[in-house]
Amino acid sequence: MALDPQSILLTDRVAVVTGAAAGIGRAIALAFARFGAHVAVCDRDADNLAVTAREIAAAGRTAVSAVLDVREPELVRRFADDVRARLTAVDVLVNNAGGGFMAPFLDVSEKGQDALVRENFGQVSHCIRAVVPLMTTGRGSIINITSIEAHRAGPGFAVYSAMKAAVASLTKSLALELGERMIRVNCIAPDVIPTPGIGEVAVKTPLPRAGHVDDVAGAALFLASDLSQFVTGSTLHVDGGNWAAGGWHRGATGFTT
């Protein structure tokens, strides 16, 4: 099979991106549009989501936009119904929405823990259940945005880390369950990506720079395209080498632990 330069394009495919008002979600949605996809986006931030939708339209692609909380399964189902009515089928789902707060595990209340579970795991399952029935083209791709914290200890973020690890595990199971439908399921695990939610990040990575949201968007573009059509059940680490470093950090005189 000879590789075709057109294989990176998403011409006239349909993508759904959650948490698309800013940061990584917006970058992915806009990259998909620039590479040819029509994009349905959702977020709780109405003003910034409208900006994302306008930029998708400016790229000459159809934008479907919905202000909603993906933690609510009925709202997610309605959004999926709207996408079906407007765009017929879905080729790509990016589960980007999520969030957390820093606190020692023993200081996290039951209410806080339940919120973290809903925010970082429950909503992913809602979106997958709602969108998979729309993946009827024989080339589906589900991309779950996790974190380096899914693969290492996360002191101060214990429940958040556990939920990201749960999504990584779910990804592997669904890669097997959905494979016969030709739906691929993969993760992207970012680190040191400054976004509006986390501020500046110190640069101690093997690659001596902070990441950019477009670094994650590029990985998502690969996983959405035909270039990755034999890739499923995997995690792509977009972290400047931090996962590989395993505790080593770049300093003024070299690497230290």
Language model: regions and residue ranges:
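Canonical Rossmann dinucleotide-binding motif of NAD(H)/NADP(H)-dependent dehydrogenases/reductases
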Residues: L9-A40
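Residue(s) in the substrate-gating loop at a strand-loop-helix junction
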Residues: S147
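Active-site helix of classical SDR
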Residues: I128, M163, T171
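Alpha-helical segment proximal to the catalytic Tyr-Lys
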Residues: P133, L176-E180, Q229
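A conserved structural motif in NAD(P)-dependent oxidoreductases
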Residues: T205-V216, L227
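Substrate-binding pocket helix/loop in short-chain dehydrogenase/reductase
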Residues: P104-F105, S109-V117, V201
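Short-chain dehydrogenase/reductase
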Residues: Q229-W243
